[in-house]
């Protein structure tokens, strides 16, 4: 929205065109805007959640240190998502179909997560939205979105899967393979981030790092100078440049949320936040065809999800025997005696290393 205002004002005030003509400037401005919105609205929202008694539900079989988290305000993901949408509408180019798709993803998955949280925390339904209903909604949306993205990206000739650490090695993809891969990426990422969000600040830092990494790739691929210099296929579509702008909004809002979510957490994001952030990261990776880079940078999420799958599989196939003391795996380390803060910081370090490996792939090709 502001891009059009500054474009008009630039005819009367020299220098203001930088706010409408340069993606890099808008990346900076949207990150600052989303950060300030989240910081400004964070405290009032926490007080409102406390007043409404919308608090965290803690598992009875979990670590004893978690009992103090009971009734900590949750559904704070609404704060993140609202900040991202407002910032995107302010600083994004509203002519970009990709920006609107990302906003739609935030709204749809946010609605699923919100309804799930509402059932569990407000109506006191023990299991919330049934898993099969949640999966059905996610699946239908993901398949439709995958088909839409296939036709949009095929117009730009973006139907090759990029292989990290190589210059010209790509895997061509038809509609069937593309839809299947996109389906698993969106749903897998959504649920993996949801499983990771179990300790104070644990999920939001990896989310910010992955969003930053994907944003860097999006910026490079839509900038002809950088793309040619770094030997990336140039995407001649300014609409996709808005993906980098959107990633910056995720980073700003995520960092501000960490202010309230760091140990001891004053608020949790809930399913409304974790399900949505995971889904939107998956969609971004597909849009810029960096699915494998997303896998590398987000490997922490993959490990968390795999630990749950292995635990459930072992319990069912081995007569109740478990691999881990508790799943997801961050709880396993807690039950081994690691303090919560040590688990979180060490997982952040792992996530940072994975982020840096993903960035190394920009140059080492």
From Swiss-Prot:
Q: Does the keyword field hold Translocase?
A: no
Give the record's GO biological process terms.
cell division; cell wall organization; peptidoglycan biosynthetic process; regulation of cell shape
GO CC terms, sorted:
plasma membrane
Primary localisation category: membrane
What is this protein identified as? Phospho-N-acetylmuramoyl-pentapeptide-transferase
InterPro entries listed in its UniProt record: Glycosyl_transferase_4, PNAcMuramoyl-5peptid_Trfase, PNAcMuramoyl-5peptid_Trfase_CS
Membrane-spanning segments: 22-42, 74-94, 95-115, 134-154, 169-189, 201-221, 240-260, 268-288, 292-312, 342-362
Documented EC number(s): 2.7.8.13
The task this protein performs is described as: Catalyzes the initial step of the lipid cycle reactions in the biosynthesis of the cell wall peptidoglycan: transfers peptidoglycan precursor phospho-MurNAc-pentapeptide from UDP-MurNAc-pentapeptide onto the lipid carrier undecaprenyl phosphate, yielding undecaprenyl-pyrophosphoryl-MurNAc-pentapeptide, known as lipid I.
Catalytic activity line of the entry: UDP-N-acetyl-alpha-D-muramoyl-L-alanyl-gamma-D-glutamyl-meso-2,6-diaminopimeloyl-D-alanyl-D-alanine + di-trans,octa-cis-undecaprenyl phosphate = di-trans,octa-cis-undecaprenyl diphospho-N-acetyl-alpha-D-muramoyl-L-alanyl-D-glutamyl-meso-2,6-diaminopimeloyl-D-alanyl-D-alanine + UMP
Which species expresses this protein natively? Francisella philomiragia subsp. philomiragia (strain ATCC 25017 / CCUG 19701 / FSC 153 / O#319-036)
Q: One MF term in GO for this entry?
A: phospho-N-acetylmuramoyl-pentapeptide-transferase activity
**How does this protein sit in the membrane?**
Multi-pass membrane protein
This protein's encoding gene: mraY
What NCBIfam families is this protein classified in? Answer: mraY
Q: Which UniProt keywords apply?
A: Cell cycle, Cell division, Cell inner membrane, Cell membrane, Cell shape, Cell wall biogenesis/degradation, Magnesium, Membrane, Metal-binding, Peptidoglycan synthesis, Transferase, Transmembrane, Transmembrane helix
Please report which protein family the annotation says this sequence is part of: Belongs to the glycosyltransferase 4 family. MraY subfamily.
Q: Which domain of life is it from?
A: Bacteria
Pfam families named in the record:
Glycos_transf_4, MraY_sig1
- Cellular compartment(s): Cell inner membrane
**Pathway per the UniProt entry:** Cell wall biogenesis; peptidoglycan biosynthesis
Note the CDD domains from the entry.
GT_MraY
Give cofactor(s), names only: Mg(2+)
Coiled-coil segments, which residues? none
């Amino acid at each position: 929205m502001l891009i059009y205002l500054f474009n008009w004002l630039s005819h009367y005030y020299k220098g203001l065109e930088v706010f409408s003509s340069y993606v890099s400037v808008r990346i900076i401005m949207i990150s600052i805007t989303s950060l300030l919105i989240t910081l400004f609205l964070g405290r009032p929202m926490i007080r409102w959640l406390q007043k409404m008694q919308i608090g965290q539900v803690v598992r009875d079989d979990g670590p004893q240190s978690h009992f103090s988290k009971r009734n900590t305000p949750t559904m704070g993901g609404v704060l993140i998502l609202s900040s991202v949408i407002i910032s995107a509408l302010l600083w994004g180019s509203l002519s970009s179909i990709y920006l609107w798709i990302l906003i739609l993803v935030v709204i749809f998955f946010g609605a699923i997560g919100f309804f799930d949280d509402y059932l569990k925390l407000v109506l006191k339904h023990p299991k919330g939205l049934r898993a099969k209903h949640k999966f059905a909604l996610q699946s239908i949306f993901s398949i439709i979105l995958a088909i839409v993205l296939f036709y949009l990206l095929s117009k730009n000739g973006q139907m090759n899967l990029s292989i990290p650490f190589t210059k010209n090695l790509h895997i061509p993809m038809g509609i069937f393979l593309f839809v299947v891969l996109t389906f698993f990426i969106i749903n897998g990422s959504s649920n993996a981030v949801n499983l990771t969000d179990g300790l104070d600040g644990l999920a939001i830092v990896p989310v910010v790092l992955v969003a930053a990494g994907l944003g860097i790739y999006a910026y490079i691929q839509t900038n002809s100078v950088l793309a040619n210099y770094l030997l990336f296929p140039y995407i001649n579509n300014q609409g996709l440049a808005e993906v980098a702008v959107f990633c910056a909004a995720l980073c700003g809002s995520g960092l501000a949320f960490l202010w309230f979510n760091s140990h001891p957490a004053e608020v949790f994001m809930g399913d409304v936040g974790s399900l949505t952030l995971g889904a939107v990261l998956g969609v971004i990776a597909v849009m810029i065809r960096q699915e494998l880079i997303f896998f590398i940078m987000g490997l922490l999420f993959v490990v968390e999800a795999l630990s749950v799958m292995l635990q459930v599989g072992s319990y069912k196939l081995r007569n109740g025997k478990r691999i881990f003391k508790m799943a997801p795996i961050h709880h396993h380390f807690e039950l081994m005696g690691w303090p919560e803060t040590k688990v979180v910081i060490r997982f952040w370090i792992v996530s940072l290393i994975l982020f840096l490996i993903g960035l190394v792939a920009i140059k080492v090709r």
